Design a protein with these regions (language model features):
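N-terminal binding-site loop/beta-alpha segment at the start of enzyme catalytic domains
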Residues: 1-76
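Conserved, mostly hydrophobic/aromatic
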Residues: 6, 18, 50, 65, ...
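Short, well-ordered coil/turn segments that N-cap beta-strands
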Residues: 11-16, 46-49, 72-76, 116-120, ...
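Active-site mouth loops of central-metabolism enzymes
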Residues: 21-33, 90-104, 129-131
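Short, acidic/polar
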Residues: 29-42, 98-115, 160-169
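Alpha-helix-loop-beta-strand connector modules within alpha/beta enzyme cores
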Residues: 62-81, 138-148
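Active-site groove signature of glycoside hydrolases
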Residues: 111-130
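Beta/alpha (TIM)-barrel catalytic core signal, keyed to glycine-rich beta->alpha loops juxtaposed to Asp/Glu
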Residues: 127-323
Length: 323
């Protein structure tokens, strides 16, 4: 497993990370009872970067990591996130809460669940522009660095794609890393962020499972994360990707492998696919042994200009509902 630097922090992360949300959340169909087994297997297979948040499974994700990793704390890199208040829900859903009192409380609880006295990367979770530009919040995050509670601080953009301005502002403020969506259909704003020398964690490399043939046929579900996409968008993404799938098959590759390898070609620190079980973990790790040739890369780039760019634009526009 190759390691990459997380920007200028000196932290090295495995190029393939394990996202805990897909193990403990109904949104990705994970099995909580088997989550610890997947984490342990991931470590055995060389993954040392684990991406979680306090809200994943309402604390369960962090507990799973602590239970599974045990004494390996100094051998792994843990990213967790705060800012989505699941302790005080509205209409059954967490709310954004960036008051300093809440952040102190949330971070303390995260450390308790993780059974550690520090996190490697601490990120604000889906903040709005006002939170990102807040000097009070920024200073608070950097105080955590000075106190040794966080080795680095950043911003996780979401839940959707179109947070370019917020990402750029976070970089300008001095946050050391971003987490964002990127795949060969939804290439912006990720390729803009790629130009900056910061830590970059990529999620959803399979475009809400449209680029993972093992998850087809895809259906809309209010429980699943792909509810952020219309079923019509996903169907078009699957249809437009067929020439890539067919070419890949002739070369002994799966579409999900192509999607992962294409993303790994870029200057990102770590790519975190949606891993719901041991089978997903094994096939994603095994994909790292494959290679893309120029014919596949060229076809992807051609189809982006002729087909995917319109889907990318629609994804950017859907974010307006969350701003």
């Amino acid at each position: 497993m190759r390691l990459r630097y997380f920007g200028t922090t000196g932290i090295k992360v495995s190029e393939l990370g394990l996202g805990i949300w897909s193990l403990v959340s109904e949104e990705w169909g994970g099995d909580v009872d088997k989550a610890e087994e997947v984490v342990r297997k991931a470590y055995e297979m060389g993954i040392t970067f684990f991406d979680t948040a306090d809200v994943y499974g309402e604390g369960k994700g962090e507990e799973v990591l602590a239970n599974a990793l045990g004494t390996k704390r100094d051998k792994v890199v843990i990213l967790t996130k705060v800012g989505l208040d699941f302790y005080n829900k509205k209409h059954g859903r967490p709310t954004l809460n960036y008051s300093l009192d809440y952040l102190r409380f949330a971070i303390k609880r995260s450390l308790e669940r993780l059974r550690t006295d520090y996190v490697d990367i601490l990120m604000l979770h889906n903040p709005k522009m006002a939170h990102i530009t807040s000097k009070e919040i920024f200073d608070f995050m950097h105080e955590l660095k000075k106190d040794g509670i966080a080795r680095s601080v950043g911003v996780a953009l979401g839940p959707t794609l179109g947070w370019l301005d917020e990402g750029i502002k976070a970089i300008e403020m001095g946050y050391e890393g971003l987490e964002f969506i990127y795949n060969f259909i939804e290439r912006e704003p990720g390729e803009t962020f790629e130009k900056y020398n910061i830590g970059k964690v990529v999620r959803v490399p399979h475009a809400s499972d449209a680029l993972d043939e093992e998850k087809n046929p895809l259906e809309f579900s209010p429980k699943l994360h792909r509810r952020f996409k219309s079923l019509e968008w996903i169907r078009r993404a699957v249809e437009y990707s067929k020439p890539i799938k067919e070419l890949a098959e002739r070369k002994g590759l799966k579409l999900y492998e192509v999607a992962l390898l294409y993303t790994l070609r870029h200057d990102f620190s770590s790519v975190v696919p949606n891993t719901a079980n041991l089978h997903d973990l094994e096939r994603f790790v095994n994909a790292l042994n494959k290679e893309l040739d120029e014919e596949i890369i060229s076809l992807i780039d051609q189809l982006y200009e002729s087909k995917f760019k319109e889907l990318n634009q629609e994804s950017l526009e859907e974010t307006n509902a969350y701003k």
